[in-house]
Amino acid sequence: MYLEKQTIINRGSVFVFGLTFAFSAQAQSNDKSVVDIIESQMIWVEGGTFMMGQTVVDSNESTNKSAARVEGQTPDDDSPHVDELPAHSVTLDGFYISCYETTQLVWEAVMGSNPSFFPGANQPVESVSWNMVQTFINKLNNTYHTNYRLPTEAEWEFATRGGNKSKGYRYSGSDVVDDVAWFSNDELEHPQPVGGKTPNELGLYD
């Protein structure tokens, strides 16, 4: 889950919550505020321009669709990536982003409960709806007088592609999926702790 706030210099800041600290939510609240911990994980993403959406090099499927577009044909509206076409140029201001996903530790520290089906403080929070996320954001902002929000799709995609440091990898940080993602049947049986794979060019994990 990704959140953004405006800084005093009007610079957008995207925050991806996710912490690997091995302590309880109660200990966290006594020693350091949730916001202090979240901000300690932030990585600056320099603003820039990139091609958003599926491109010819993204996949064989997108190659076929791009060819169809060139020929004036319309891709199948039921295809999984049709809403990612055509690729188009997007320019973004700089923002901050955390190196991890939002963990159950952070969620519980804010909400006082953990809805996740697979409990684990350092695992990403799951089993949450969009409305639940909005409630989480509102409570975080009201409690700590912050101005967080969910990022745009473009902000998220730019960061996962490596921003201005992108080396054009097939996956986020590598051409070898096992380096950067959990994908095998055994690994997908339950969520994995954050930060367990190689980071991408910006230092973002998972």
Predicted regions located by residue number:
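Bacterial N-terminal signal peptides
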Residues: 12-22
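A domain-start/cap signature at the N-terminus of enzymes
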Residues: 31-33
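Functional-site microenvironments in short loops/helix caps that host divalent-cation chemistry
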Residues: 51, 56, 60, 64, ...
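N-terminal compositionally biased, intrinsically disordered segments and leader/signal-like regions
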Residues: 8-9, 21, 56, 64
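N-terminal secretory signal peptides that target proteins for export/translocation
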Residues: 1-9
